[in-house]
């Protein structure tokens, strides 16, 4: 019996020490920035919003399919937590109009950035789920002036169950 309790206690301590993937347990309007970081770990990026909030970005990648943005008020209280990599957010990507700053705000840091020498453009890559929860790759091509030039949303056949070697 003592061994069982000891094993259970160690397991609970281990789980308590793990970072939360999506911030489960945090309460908007109550949880503090310190509690957010204690639960979710250090953010990959911090930005200051026009309203003075600090936005903490938690991409769960590079193979992950989610990026969470946690808004923290100037007083250090969490206001909201949002999953950014959604099909609805794709509507915000308008070639020739959307800026790289808007992409960073709406999608968070990319999983990978590559460069196209001939076109003198960068390609920001995100991995996410489509409307039917199938894996997709989002490629956002941006030019040197910081404007989105092309958006590709392609099904990722290599990440589908049994999809290795397809495509």
Feature-to-residue mapping (PLM):
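Bacterial N-terminal signal peptides that target proteins for export
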Residues: 1-8
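Residues within mature, well-folded domains
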Residues: 19-167
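C-terminal motif of bacterial Sec signal peptides marking the signal peptidase cleavage site
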Residues: 15-17
């Amino acid at each position: 019996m003592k061994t069982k309790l000891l094993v259970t206690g160690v397991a609970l301590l281990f789980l308590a020490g793990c970072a939360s993937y999506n911030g489960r347990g945090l309460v908007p309007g109550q949880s503090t920035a310190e509690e957010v970081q204690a639960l979710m770990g250090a953010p990959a990026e911090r930005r200051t919003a026009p309203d003075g909030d600090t936005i903490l970005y938690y991409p769960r990648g590079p193979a992950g399919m989610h990026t969470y943005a946690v808004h923290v008020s100037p007083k250090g209280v969490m206001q909201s937590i949002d999953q950014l990599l959604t099909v609805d957010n794709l509507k915000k990507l308008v070639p020739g109009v959307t800026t790289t700053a808007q992409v960073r705000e709406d999608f968070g840091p990319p999983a990978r950035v590559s460069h196209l020498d001939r076109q003198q453009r960068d390609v920001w890559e995100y991995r996410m789920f489509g409307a039917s929860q199938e894996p997709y790759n989002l490629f956002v091509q941006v030019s040197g002036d910081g404007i989105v030039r092309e958006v590709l949303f392609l099904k990722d056949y290599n990440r589908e169950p049994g999809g290795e070697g397809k495509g």
